[in-house]
Amino acid sequence: LNVNSKPDLGLHMDINNSMEETPTALARALVKAGRKGEAEAVISGLIAAEFGHQVRSVSINSDAYSLNSLNGFADTDKGAFFFKFHQEEGEGRMAGEYYRARILADAGLPVDLPLEASTTPGRQILLYRLRRDRRLAEVARDFDQERDPTRFEGVLSAQAALDHAVAAVYLKTLHPISAAQSEAEPIHRLFHERLRDFDRPAELGGRFASFYRDQEFHLPGLVLNWRDLSRLTISVNGIRYSETLESLFAAAFTELAPAQFAGAGVVAHGDAHNANVWVEGPSATLRLVLFDPAFAGEHVPALLAEVKPTFHNVFAHPYWLYEPKVAEARFQAMAERRGDVLAIETDYALSPLRQAFLDTKRDLLWRPLLAELRSRGQLPVHWRRLLKLALFCCPVLVMSLRAGAGMHNPVSSAIGLAVAAMMGGEPVGGEDPLSRFLDAIAPDPAASQR
C-alpha cells in the first residue's frame, strides 16, 4: 500500500464494536476481515506517530506462523525496515512491558536488536533493519517429509547450538523470584492471561470463553457441543487420557496463576519458537538469531521459559496448526463417541525432524535445567503437572481449535484435540511422545509426579 496521509483510525471502528480501539488490535482485525490495505494504512499511521517517519509504503506479509502478530516491510524517509508486533486482547490491562530486547543481549543470547521500538500497549511495534533471511520455521518445514536424518543435519545442528546457548543463559541467570516478580512478567500473557476475564478476574473466561463456551465442534463423523465435548475423556489411537477438557481448563486457570510461580526465574525470550528465529549464513554453517522478544524478561519463571518453543517447534507440526488445509490432505482422522469417551483415530505423527528437535531440547536444555533446579531445592514437586498444563495452553489458546472458526477443518480440529489431550492429560496404561519426554527429563523418578 502506498501511503500519502495518516489514516483516520476512527473510520474503521465499525469493523467490530467490541474490539479494543488501539492501532495494533485494529490492524489485526482488519487483516482477519480481508481488509489488508486498510490494515497497512493503520500501521503506516502507527509508525509515523510513534517514530516521526514519513511513511511511503507498507506491505504486510501473508504469514501462516503469525497467529497473534503481524509483520512486513515499511519504506520511509529514514530508510526501509522490517516491522513486527504481537497483539493480545486486553493487553492494556495486563502486567509487564513488551519488547525488552536489551536484557537478552546483555545476558549473552543471540538476538537481533530492533533499530526502533514502541512498547506502549496497543501501540507496540518494532522496526528492524531490512533483511530477507528466512526464519527457522520456514527452513524446518522443508524437511517435514524427509525420512533421512542426514538431510537435515545442518538444521538440527543449528537448533542444538541455539538450545545449548539458551540453556547456558538459563543456568547462568537462574535466581530466586518472588510472587510479585513473577506476576510482573509479560510471559503470563501467553498462558494464564488468555484464560482470564478482566471484568470478572476470579472466573475462567478470556479466550476459553470466546473460543469454546457454548460452541459446536464439527469433527470427522461427529458433531458435539462444547458442553458435551468438555466432559468427555479423550482417547487417541486407543490410548485414553486421564482428564476431560473441562478439568484441564479449570486446572490451568487455577494452577498457572502468575503468583504460583514464585521460586526460580531466569532471563528468557519467552516465545522463542522458530518463527521468531532468523537463519543466517550458508547451509553448512547456519547461525540462528532470535527476534521479536515481546515477552522477554529477567524474572521469567524457569518452568515457563521454554514451554512455547517446546510446543511450537515440535507438537504444532507437521502442518495441523499452521497449515490445516495441508494436514487435511496428508492425514486422516475419525472421531466417535463411545459412552463418556471421545475416541479419535488418526495417522498424524511427529516427523523425524520434529522428534529430533524434541530429543535435542530434552538433552541440551530441559535435563540440565531441571537438574539444577532440583539441586538448588527450587524444583516444585508438581513440576510435571505445571509443564503439562502450560503445554496444554499452547494448542487450545493460540487459536480456536474449532473447524470453521478460523483456519481449522474437521480433520485438523480432531488432530488438535488429540494433541491437546496429550499435552494436558496423562496417558492411562500407555505412553506417548510427551510422556516419554517428561520421563526422560525428570531428575529422578521421585521428582516426577504423574
Where do the language-model regions lie?
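ATP-binding glycine-rich loop module of kinase domains
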Residues: 70-94
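The N-lobe alphaC helix and its flanking beta3-alphaC-beta4 segment of protein kinase-like domains
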Residues: 91-104
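Conserved HxN/HPN-centered segment at the entrance to the catalytic loop
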Residues: 105-117
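ATP-dependent phospho-/nucleotidyl transfer catalytic cores
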Residues: 139-269, 280-283
